[in-house]
Amino acid sequence: TDHLGREVTIEKQPESFVSGYYISTSLLIALGLDDQLVGVEAKADKRNIYKLSAPELTELPSVGTAKEFDLEGCAALKPDLVIVPTKLKDSIPAMEELGLTVIAVNPEDQTKLFETIDMISTAADVVEKGQELEYWISDALESLKKSLDGVETPSVYLAGNSSLLQTAGPEMYQSTLIENAGGVNAASDITDTYWADTSY
């Protein structure tokens, strides 16, 4: 069951993936599956984490963004499994008509991040690696929490990449990162969007 509540049947262990979302791409790298990626989201060559951990990904075909996903380009890559953000829910029926197996993920808080790891590791038959990744993250968060004991909780404004007046709302994983680091998201009251426009 994916994050849209869809029951997805995977007939055989996938050997090739398309990831239309940087978080799922990063998780595929962490699970040791980057060599099975055949297509990734747009602007992969701009992400330093890819350049450092899996530079070959920057040369893969782009399947676009959540706003402009390249259905035909994705289908042409003939992946065994496509992983997309839930924002692309309206495009999934068309993907399935093209014969693609699709799971939709929304790893925008700690629980959903672990659910996404579970989904991907189960689909790829690397459950043990998925569990190891979750244990590693949990241990790191616990150590961080202990180090912050008694520290004052600051209000944090996280500016967007495209504008200093754009900030991450509480529906985004960036808000979880702020909380994990001992802060409070200054935009926590904005609940109707992901990136929110602000003014001064």
Regions found by a protein language model. Name each.
Residues 23-26, 43-46, 81-82, 87-92, ...:
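Solvent-exposed loop/turn segments at secondary-structure junctions
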Residues 16-20, 156:
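Short periplasmic/luminal acceptor-recognition loop of GT-C membrane glycosyltransferases, typified by
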Residues 7-9, 91-166, 184-189:
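Extracytoplasmic substrate-binding proteins
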Residues 1-12:
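Short, low-complexity disordered leader/linker segments with a strong preference
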Residues 166-196:
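Alpha-helical, coiled-coil/dimerization segments enriched in small aliphatic residues
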Residues 3-5, 60-72, 190-200:
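Short helix-initiation/N-cap motifs at beta->coil->alpha
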Residues 33, 56-58, 98-100, 181-182:
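Short, structured coil segments at secondary-structure junctions
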Residues 19-77, 81, 87:
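A short, structured surface patch at a secondary-structure boundary
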